């Protein structure tokens, strides 16, 4: 025993279970949480944008990242469906506009103006009734 308590193994202690494998590969916070968006970058932005040098926990950054990823996936899925309905393969700002304004919850959440998004197609019911009445009158006369 060379100057210390315990066993003298001559090297680093095992510190737990020993397996035949080498050291574990490093995993990012995003990989551990099963996310595609970068947790480290979101944490950095949270730290930069807080007042009075507040601390930001790692779990808070993971949670915010998960929420951002979910909302992005939801919007892209709806926009992809809108693009597919119009038989095109590229999502444009118009498709994003149709997707967001077509979903009631996303519409209340995202109140921003989307550049080149256009307007939603809408015809007042009073105008539709007049057109339908004219068609009926033509059918009766014929």
Curated annotation (Swiss-Prot):
Bilayer-spanning residue ranges: none
SMART domains registered for this protein in UniProt: H2A
CDD domains referenced in this protein's UniProt entry, alphabetically: HFD_H2A (cd00074)
Cellular localization per UniProt: Nucleus; Chromosome
Keywords: Acetylation, Chromosome, DNA-binding, Nucleosome core, Nucleus
Biased composition, class Gly residues, residue ranges: 1-19
Gene Ontology CC entries for this record: nucleosome; nucleus
UniProt cross-references to Pfam families, sorted A to Z: Histone (PF00125), Histone_H2A_C (PF16211)
Keyword Metal-binding: no
Record keyword Acetylation present: yes
Record PTM N6-acetyllysine, positions in chain: 5, 12
Highest taxon above the source species: Eukaryota
A GO MF label: DNA binding
Residue ranges, annotated region (Disordered): 1-35
Post-translational modification summary for this protein: Acetylated once deposited into chromatin.
Function: Variant histone H2A which can replace H2A in some nucleosomes. Nucleosomes wrap and compact DNA into chromatin, limiting DNA accessibility to the cellular machineries which require DNA as a template. Histones thereby play a central role in transcription regulation, DNA repair, DNA replication and chromosomal stability. DNA accessibility is regulated via a complex set of post-translational modifications of histones, also called histone code, and nucleosome remodeling.
UniProt subunit comment: The nucleosome is a histone octamer containing two molecules each of H2A, H2B, H3 and H4 assembled in one H3-H4 heterotetramer and two H2A-H2B heterodimers. The octamer wraps approximately 147 bp of DNA. H2A or its variant H2A.Z forms a heterodimer with H2B. H2A.Z associates with the VPS72/SWC2 subunit of the SWR1 chromatin remodeling complex. Also interacts with RBP1/DNA-directed RNA polymerase II largest subunit.
Similarity field: Belongs to the histone H2A family.
UniProt protein name: Histone H2A.Z
